[in-house]
């Protein structure tokens, strides 16, 4: 089973060396505990062993293991899609949301539209409704800016450099996400996003949680709350105070 770790990591081409080492360490530790035969019982034993770790460490390990378990299921190595869950008592202890380990979002996907939706929310804090309304005319790749129009208001947000290559192939369209020159519906967007996050081993992630991840990353980078509010199109910082 250990050789499957190498195969799993080989499919994660976008990961840094440090990220791969972290995955490898967590997965080897996981297999040391569950053994060669993965079952509901062995997974419960492993979860019990995690109980004394910090919440952030538990979430990291569970995330890595769930992605690995999904990989094994896809390859036919296990007969069921097993999944670890954070213990209820651990969830209650969490006072503030944690930054999730989402490097895998930058890797290739069978759901490219869902992937781009997720990245736009995660990296820019945009709402799905805002994303669906984006016209390519609102995008200036040379200056790395995007104009967001909402009701009677407009705001200009910076496009992260990493997203430029993702947007460039779509610049010949009318809308960023379209069919026959018309934008897709919110239901379509949520289905695409749902399929993508499930593929990456995060089936419970929603657009709201991804937007929260954007906020947490901004705060970790010491961005002022007023600047974050401006990026999100918020009139006040009241809803951001809880993240201090």
Swiss-Prot record:
Q: Which domain of life is it from?
A: Bacteria
Which stretches make up the Tyr recombinase domain?
Answer: 90-244
Gene Ontology molecular-function annotations: DNA binding; tyrosine-based site-specific recombinase activity
Question: What biological processes does GO assign it?
Answer: DNA transposition
Any idea which UniProt keywords this protein has?
Answer: Cytoplasm, DNA integration, DNA recombination, DNA-binding
Gene3D superfamilies tied to this protein: 1.10.150.130, Intergrase catalytic core
Q: Provide the active-site residues from the annotation.
A: 150, 211, 243 (o-(3'-phospho-dna)-tyrosine intermediate)
Keyword DNA-binding assigned: yes
Of the GO CC terms on this record, one is:
cytoplasm
> Which Pfam family, an example, fits this chain?
Phage_int_SAM_1
Q: Function of this protein?
A: Putative tyrosine recombinase. Not involved in the cutting and rejoining of the recombining DNA molecules on dif(SL) site.
Q: Which family does it belong to?
A: Belongs to the 'phage' integrase family. XerD-like subfamily.
- Protein name, please? Tyrosine recombinase XerD-like
**The organism of origin for this protein:** Streptococcus pneumoniae (strain CGSP14)
């Amino acid at each position: 089973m250990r050789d499957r770790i190498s195969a799993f990591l080989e499919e994660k081409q976008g990961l840094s060396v440090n990220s791969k080492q972290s995955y490898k360490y967590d997965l080897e530790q996981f297999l040391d505990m569950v053994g060669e035969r993965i079952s509901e019982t062995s997974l419960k034993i492993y979860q019990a062993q995690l109980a004394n770790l910090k919440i952030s460490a538990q979430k990291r390990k569970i995330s890595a293991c769930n992605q690995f378990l999904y990989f094994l299921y896809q390859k036919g190595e296990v007969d069921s899609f097993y999944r670890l869950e954070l213990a209820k008592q651990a969830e209650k202890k969490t006072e503030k949301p944690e930054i999730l380990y989402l490097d895998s979002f930058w890797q290739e996907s069978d759901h490219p539209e869902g992937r781009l939706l997720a990245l736009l929310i995660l990296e820019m804090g945009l709402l799905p409704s805002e994303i669906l309304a984006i016209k390519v005319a609102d995008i200036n790749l040379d200056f790395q800016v995007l104009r967001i129009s909402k009701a009677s208001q407009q705001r200009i947000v910076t496009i992260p450099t990493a997203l430029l290559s993702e947007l460039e192939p779509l610049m010949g369209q009318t809308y960023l996400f379209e069919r026959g020159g018309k934008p897709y519906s919110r239901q379509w967007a949520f289905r695409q996003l749902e399929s993508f996050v499930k593929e990456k081993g995060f089936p419970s992630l929603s657009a709201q949680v991804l937007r929260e991840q954007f906020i947490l990353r901004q705060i970790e980078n010491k961005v002022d709350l007023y600047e974050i509010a401006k990026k999100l199109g918020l009139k006040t910082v009241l809803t951001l105070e809880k993240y201090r």
